[in-house]
Amino acid sequence: MSETKIVVACCQLSLAVGDAEGNRAKVRSAISDAARAGARVVVLPELANTGYMFADIDELRAAAEPLNGPTVTEWANLAAQHGLIIVGGFAELGDGGLVYNSAVLVDASGVRTRYRKAHLWNREKDNLFTPGFDLPPVVNTAVGRIGVMICYDLEFPEWVRTVALDGA
């Protein structure tokens, strides 16, 4: 049986709360660098559009974007331009002003899935983020099945087990 090498780039970035355009520029550069280095999959940090931590819900809400906002739209365009799969976290502004700690998986076809972090740690659930309630999604991609979770979700074995049982 032959092995297929898949290059995955995990981007560690210093992002600043309140600097949306600066954050997008840093992420854009990291994605382009990863593509030039041969990556097929690019993984961005949690809350890559906003940086992290927030003073209060007002600061968070001001920085959050809808799913079809400029950050996710740009990631989808970059995925198409470079032939990548991009998984990235963003502060999602939902209906009624609710804010979710979300992640998307995008590729050349656009947004394939969105996941809202279910397991919030103390500071996140203290009047900041609304928890998601769906199980982590698993998506068929050009490189195989990819599951999407965010940070603290990984500390819950049954959560990880569902993704593994679904083939990720």
Where in the sequence are the language-model features?
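N-terminal active-site segment of His-dependent metallophosphoesterases
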Residues: M1-R40
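Residue-level preference for short coil/turn positions at secondary-structure junctions
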Residues: S2-T4, A37-G38, A80-H82, V99, ...
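Residue-level recognition of beta-strand->loop/alpha-helix junctions
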Residues: Q12-S14, P45, R116
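Catalytic metal-binding/acid-base residues of hydrolase active sites
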Residues: S14, A48, A91-E92, D153-E155
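Cys-nucleophile CN-hydrolase/nitrilase-fold catalytic domain and related Cys-dependent amidase chemistry
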Residues: A20, S32-A108, R114
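Aromatic/hydrophobic pocket-lining residues that form the small-molecule binding cavity
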Residues: V27, V72, F156
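Active-site catalytic loop in hydrolytic enzyme cores
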Residues: N77, G94-D166
